């Protein structure tokens, strides 16, 4: 039993994941890991085993990319690395600091904007996002949770983390075991995900004519 949060009332990890799984509304079947992935604001502050952290980055490493350019880079710090952790933490805006302060690991994804030959990589951000998704899904498989945060000071991250020109900070990620929402403020607790809401597929998937829903999802 790993990552057992107190708010699950001592359910097993599998039962806890099933409880979250039941919150999603999927008219068509998808993999359980995709159903179970979520972005919490409550983290348990216990450390993540190093082998699990290595597994996250190995998953990210195997993401697809244009011409196998692999533009993603990750800065990572655990709470044991106090100065490094604070360097990343201090880049977060106040609201995200309040939700991420218990997370034992912080990461910053960064995209290399050009190929090794110096030519621009127009898909660097897309490919870095795919690597992050691999990482997040792997975290779910290991009983961890990950919250991606766009609210951070990009210029401060560039300076404090010595990110060179030609690289773009993309997203900050807090990773940990699920925590107890009762330890949060009322405001943050109210923001914890309840029933995830997604637009219907008819609004997202078109035929080869813009905004004409694909015949896969047309009614009648």
Stretches with model-predicted labels:
Residues 2-220:
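Acidic, surface-exposed loops and disordered segments
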